[in-house]
Amino acid sequence: MSLIQEIKEQVLQGNQIAKAEALQLYGEPLEELCLAADEIRYQFCGNRFDLCTIINGKSGRCSENCKYCAQSACYHTEIEEYPLLAVEKIKEQAKYNEERGVLRYSIVTSGKALNDTEVEHVCESVREIHKESKIKVCVSGGLLNETQFRKLKQAGVTRVHNNLETSRQNFPNVCTTHTYEDKIAAIRAAWKAGIEVCSGGIMGLGETVEDRIDLALEVRKLGVKSMPVNLLNPIPGTPYEHNPVLTTEEMRRIVAVFRFCFRMHGFALQEEEGFSRIKEDPALHPGQMLQFQETC
């Protein structure tokens, strides 16, 4: 029995794999690895997947210096800049997406964190959406505190998004205006407020294979149930504009190994980059996508 099959059987029996096993899997034959990951996906997730999309609710002028990000005020990316969209605009887009079969709709905003006034604006938008729609609403509002998360939950937000982006070791190479611990603190605050958390990372930030595995295991340790696996789209004007884009084969390998690490988790994958061809995922992102203009 091959190494892939041995570890697959352990996972199918409900066991978690360790870092050493994940690193071993990364170097195994791709097609066998993907087929084994698909067996794990089918046993624990079936053929169910969710459709989700986003609205760029607030754009540009971010104080943070994340090297991949078009939203940062530190770089000249010619991105459109605007404050929080009107409640009616946010509601209209929610209804538009629900009519097209989307189950989750996320209000994504630029900046380190929404202030209290902005949080209330988002809450009002969510309440208005739920007057006319049953779509589930998520929010990506940065490094919020527990009180702010509780307000979002009371308004009807079911999930918040906060990517770790990369491993703890690699993070200082990506951003220096906030820390890994800042992100983890926000994720834990969301949990305390009783909101589900979506957290993952971007592949192609100069990370090593070990960094990718460390990210996956950090997310698993935090108890996150939905993990975005994003591919860097190098934005002109950012420090990472010349970073090489990972191949589809490399992304397949990453998602397959992550499936071994997360047997029951959902993966959120970008439809535009051909991830719909990766059959290990139970969740695909359709519709409007940002060019990694993510908040903290």
Model-identified regions with their sequence ranges:
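Flexible, acidic/Gly-rich N-terminal and inter-domain linker regions that tether
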Residues: 1-64
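Core AdoMet radical
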Residues: 74-93, 97-187, 196-200, 225-230
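C-terminal accessory regions of radical SAM enzymes
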Residues: 18-20, 25, 29, 48, ...
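Conserved C-terminal portion of the radical SAM core fold
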Residues: 107, 181-240, 252-268
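Canonical Radical SAM [4Fe-4S] cluster-binding loop centered on the CxxxCxxC motif
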Residues: 45-89
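Conserved, mostly hydrophobic/aromatic
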Residues: 14, 37, 66, 162, ...
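Flexible glycine/acidic-rich beta-alpha junction loops that bind and position SAM and/or redox cofactors
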Residues: 149, 172-174, 203-210, 225-246, ...
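Short, electropositive alpha-helical surface patch
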Residues: 119-127, 155-161, 208-225, 252, ...
